[in-house]
UniProtKB/Swiss-Prot annotation:
Signal peptide: 1-24
Disulfides per UniProt: 38-71, 47-80, 56-82
Coiled-coil regions listed in the entry: none
Protein name, as recorded: Putative defensin-like protein 317
Lineage summary: Eukaryota, Viridiplantae, Streptophyta, Embryophyta, Tracheophyta
């Protein structure tokens, strides 16, 4: 019973601190994309000669190309640079 009371008090203190900070257990918003879609079942060609872009398109028919050079379809990892179709 003592350990339950201690755990409850710790959670209560943590909650009060969160409320004082102002975020109060809010769910973080997904960041806005910083780049464009790598393609969506449409063949897209990079306008820049970048092997990472070509690999991203070859391995994935859709996804976001991140600044690290990896392609992802996870919306919360939209840290990418602009990819667009060549004329």
């Amino acid at each position: 019973m003592k350990s339950f009371l201690v755990a409850f008090l710790i959670v209560l203190v943590f909650f009060c601190v969160e409320m004082k900070i102002g975020n109060g257990f809010k769910i973080h918003e997904v960041p806005e994309p910083t780049g464009k879609w790598c393609g969506y079942s449409v063949p897209m060609k990079p306008c820049i000669n970048d092997d990472r872009v070509k690999r991203c398109i070859a391995e994935n028919t859709h996804g976001w190309l991140m600044a690290t050079g990896m392609c992802t379809s996870i919306p919360s990892l939209k840290d990418c640079y602009c990819m667009h179709q060549c004329p």
